[in-house]
Amino acid sequence: MAELRYRAGKIKNPRVHKIGVIALGSHLENHGPALPIDTDAKIGAHIAFQASLESGAKFLGIVFPAYELDEIDHGVHVSLDELKANVISTLNSAKKYLDIEKVVIVNSHGGNIPLMTELYDIEDKTDLTIIFNNKIISTEGPHGGSGELSMAKVLGIINEAEIENQTDLSKYEEVGLYGFKQARENDPNIEEGARDVEENGVYVDEVYGKQLFDLAINSVVFDIEKLLDF
């Protein structure tokens, strides 16, 4: 078997090859008329891939399924148990074939946040050290709102002819999660996002989109650097 040159290329620390970065988004959910149904997946994959390029960590691709609360019916999702099982299987496969020991999961879909409660068990069943990065979720704002629109502009996946229709909330109830009354009652953050979209509308700002991406990418790179320290 050939001896691998772990120091080859633009690599600051050869131990980074033991670290993987994987996106966790959602491929099948509505985001209003201006955004594709796999917006979350593409945003998460971009962040994970760019962080991989900058740090040298292994890019592991993206998890296929996603979870969502029952009271938010805006796409096709799986149960939390099924998502957990898929993540375990995916990470075990990466560990087997790529010899990784640590992973940063880049979450770009708010519905996946409950998976954080299962991280201890996922680590136990994969024997991996895992960091769950939620930076983009905490900064992008409402579902289908200005943050996602602006990042979509950066990626070139926005339908600009439909931006004016993005806030037709009677037709596109998923924008800001406006039409999901039970979810709004249960979560003050969802209620705040829905009101923001209703009262202030949405806008597209490519500079803002780049700033959001930079914040998220830098956060993931920082997590990778933390994993290098132990």
Swiss-Prot record:
A Gene Ontology molecular function term of the record: ferrous iron binding
Positions that bind Fe cation 2: 31, 40
Keyword annotations: Hydrolase, Iron, Metal-binding, Zinc
Cofactors named for this entry: Fe(2+); Zn(2+)
Free-text comment on the cofactor: Requires one Fe(2+) ion for activity.
GO biological process entries: F420-0 metabolic process; riboflavin biosynthetic process
Entry annotated with the keyword Lipoprotein: no
The protein's annotated pathway: Cofactor biosynthesis; coenzyme F420 biosynthesis; Cofactor biosynthesis; riboflavin biosynthesis
Family, per entry: Belongs to the creatininase superfamily. FAPy deformylase family.
Subunit architecture: Homodimer.
Protein name from the UniProt record: 2-amino-5-formylamino-6-ribosylaminopyrimidin-4(3H)-one 5'-monophosphate deformylase
Organism: Methanobrevibacter smithii (strain ATCC 35061 / DSM 861 / OCM 144 / PS)
Lineage: Archaea, Methanobacteriati, Methanobacteriota, Methanomada group, Methanobacteria
Gene that this sequence comes from: arfB
